[in-house]
Amino acid sequence: MRILHTADWHLGKNIEGHSRMDEQACFLADFVEIVKDEKIDLLIIAGDVYDSYNPPARAEELFYETLKQLSDGGKRLILVIAGNHDNPQRLEAPGPLARDHGILMAGVPKTIIPTGAYGQHQVVAAGEGLCVIPASADTIRFPHLNYIPILDNGAVSPI
């Protein structure tokens, strides 16, 4: 399984009054090609997707279009986790639509991701800050809470 982790895109950022959206669009177009060329199976986007709690509409449109391309019709699994610059509820809002594309959205550390189909993948178990997805011969355990202890038997520690 090939996994790619990325973070801190800060879409919608302005520097001294100048938009960086055109640069960000070029970056994301290149990023999509890298993910395809490297045959990435699982993509983790770990926070600060946007530069502010209230990103410009163009930034949101760019993000959603990029996710759609990256998901490859639900073949590629994507986990998106909100960062301190993101509005957690806003980031999770398209979650029901994203499911068909294999995209899981976690806005807050204790998000319970609903079990069921996500594109061509299945979330078979979930709890606060954790979801479990079978993948070929492996099982993926996504602890999306910082420092969740996983016990030897695979259970989530009550601590």
Short names for language-model regions:
Residues 71-72, 99:
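Anion (oxyanion) recognition and catalysis
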Residues 1-66, 72-75, 153, 159:
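N-terminal active-site segment of His-dependent metallophosphoesterases
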Residues 55, 79-159:
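His/Asp/Glu-rich metal-coordinating catalytic cores
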